[in-house]
């Protein structure tokens, strides 16, 4: 991949460009891994400065210029108790507005061309105005009464700027029309059926300009008996959230809204904060010192800076013209509300709390099941979470989770993005050693550069504690007959060999019980070689693995078999050597590299001299299943190399093979271990990109652990996924004897279903200033990059907008989508940078394997350049994965995306021109088509149902059932539609006459259920047919060459036939796996429907043993009909 990561230190190797190197977007690839926080390197990319046309992903404005903007009519805030704080939502008045007048006709937008906005740096000695927080429904209602400019979307691809506001009596939503009667430009609140988030109406889906509109800024009001839609776009996701939350509150409480808002002021949270105040005010004076107030708030929210809390109190006193520093209870509560409420979490809470100010156990259960994908949840588990994270005693006793408890929970390790299943060994450890990637260190003894840097045993301690399973010992003759370790022919310092072996003995299995490989580069005399042997035997003892390889085997032993063993990788005397010593080729990687590259540049490689040295038999006998040999070429290795022989490749040579012989390299690594080490030209100890070699199956990619940056981030992140044990099982397509895979593919992988990764960057918390920044003050202008690292087809990146002058609680609210073609080899990297940097822009990063992602709302704990956790610094994100395979992780939700029938593509098998074999593959075509039809019919039906429910394809069926459940209730709260759960495939049964829109939902549900039933009942038979064809074809595998020769195929055609055979076998296995995963996904869908029906009380009486739960108003639902736009 192009080295697109930010904040990495070190220099690139000019002679070894990454094979996928290239510019993406406005980025320009340059030398170096990137110049991060003090690493001394150069930036790997030019910094991205995008001025994209149209609507940017996060800045939801559609770019009105000049007189296309209009001013707000200047409404004041509510004059009732709900107007506790000024609104943060109305937004600034456009510069070019026309005061007091109606907007001109040019407010119609026909395209989304965005004008470049000026950005001026300012210095402020007070809080930023945008820091005013939404902390309750009253804040939302107050903001709506003040009004906001929103964009109104019509079906003709036109967009109108209108000023929307809520009437002071909270009975109607109205907007300023351009020419029509103002009475037609309003909607009664009581007529609103639903408020839908995102672009999930027919108007949005069919609109030509929809692609330019951010999903996070769009929402729709469904109203009237005909379910018309008013489709709107806010200037920011925050404004959209305010309107959605406020309108839903109004729908829920109707004429009782004011009473509810007034009563909510004296809520559980306020009581708890008051109690905190009273515990400090022990004398009952009614006030506390500023110091005590600041310390209390910091104790409750450790991420807040003392200076920021003090500033808030001082601003409050200044606004009241109050002298002194004493803090009253009311002031303490007000500042706490403002500083400790995260609006994005408040908006999330009210989605699941039916607009209460807290979550009860059932609300929390629904959140965990529907959003977080937690299986087997019950009220007891919900109560445990509440008791663990709810700070107030009242909440714990009542089983209520307040906004503070919910925030505590979401920020806890329980809700980190990393799947805790992967914190322990979770992969099959009984495969041959060659089937694993192995965490490997190069020049382990160095703690700086490899030319003049110091050597130290702490390098070994650090690497072994990090789970490294392959370390390097470059051994030379030392004084006093004691071998030493250092980089030969350089000015690096020396350490005694014996002390290193002592440290290895102590820490070898500190982080992992699986085998440790010692890569010996032996340059010692015979005399000191014997000293090496004595030290290793005496210190390591039985840990040394010296068992001779089994000649009858074809593969190396497994990590499981080799637990607790230390393997020596080094040169070994030939078996016919009878003396006590013999000569072998030199081990100097630098010298060997010169020879290898020399061979590539001359016509007669035999003329290149090979250096040799003497090896003693005792040292040779310590080498068992990791015998070092020189690589010749792939075809020679396939024929003569033994499975216990290991070849080392310089990165330049390995890159050459990766680019020119990717298929051979992958096949070679199925049986043999390959070690790739950095070029000696990297004198600054910079790192190569390990992904360039992992994608070819290379197991031992040696990294300079002492050099932080992007490449080490990838290495460290990658090996987290299997309990950090140092071994990661390679993808099946890299292990199977017959499989078709090219490391450099820029398309989908045969037999592997692509996954769609949806990531929403919601907000950030407590970003520190870059360590190497030369700018004064603590202000940062953060933005976030999301990078995908993997095979070339998967390498991609996206960035958010910059949030100016807010590193404490920036709101990004931007969504990105990535197609992942080989999920098992993909990694996701979050990088936070400062857009106003001097000298250093790197704030923090987090790198995670795709397979370790947890879906739902998650926090990403940020790490420094050197890998330390940044205290309290995190990103808040939402993750969804669609069309994810369903096996192995039942708690992960399998989701699907729809493909139209016209675009349906069936997997194609290739012709070998070998009649008997082609006949077998021909028989496989019908079941492949059947499997595809079963899968895609199910996926299409599910997505159709999601759309009718007003949800996107990212939603799951549980969320769909929650969305439609309120509309299935009649005026008397009795269900109009129930689900009969006594049948294997639950049916919807009408209990009364229902509107056409509900009938359409029921009909679409029935069609979906039929597709689910068809897949479940037919999948096994189709699967068996595909597997039978695969087995029948494999019977030809061993003798395919001879069969092809008899058919008259010559060399090139014969090779093509073998390749086609491998392709076909890969396709058959992939299709069988996809069908199996689809069946698991379908069974999961049925479980979700069942659970949701019971939770919403929509199950037919007597069809479910669980006590029917009281139906609760959901937040989504019902298809709509486009509005006639009477109020334009």
Curated annotation (Swiss-Prot):
Biased composition (Basic and acidic residues): 1107-1128
Gene: Plcl2
The protein's name in its UniProt record: Inactive phospholipase C-like protein 2
GO MF annotation list: GABA receptor binding; inositol 1,4,5 trisphosphate binding; phosphatidylinositol-4,5-bisphosphate phospholipase C activity
Keyword terms of this UniProt record: Acetylation, Cytoplasm, Phosphoprotein, Transducer
Region (Disordered): 1-129, 1100-1128
One example of a Gene Ontology biological process annotation: negative regulation of cold-induced thermogenesis
Subcellular location: Cytoplasm
